[in-house]
Amino acid sequence: MRFSDEKMEAARNFANKLWNASRFVRMNLTIDEVRLPNADRLALEDKWILHSFNRLAESVNANLEKYEVGVALAAIYEFTWDVFCDWYIELAKARLNEKESEGNRICQQVNTYVLNGILKLLHPFMPFITEEIFSSLPHLPGD
């Protein structure tokens, strides 16, 4: 693999995007433990991001089993940047501004659940930053 300034800059930008997304999630946290509510209590955007994340996890696992590391990493990158950060976090901001509402608490749960999942998928590729962020978040029981 050749060294590339462009790839280094892209990797730095991605790490920065991940760090800022985690800061946003942590800044809006009032929960101590992640417990996803029943599906009937989830907003449409929550169902969408959870479904998208589950598809991502299946894709990453399948690609890693086939030793398609680059394909797996590209899928995580695209999901994190384009889906989670650019869409879901933007959609979540309105609900997170509704302090003390059920929608706010559910949004915190989903935000934290998906971010924890992204960090687990990214950990083999970016162990130091993912460990630092993961250790600062609440988790599912037994995580």
Regions flagged by a language model, labelled:
Residues M1-D143:
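Helix-rich, typically C-terminal accessory recognition domains appended to large enzymatic cores
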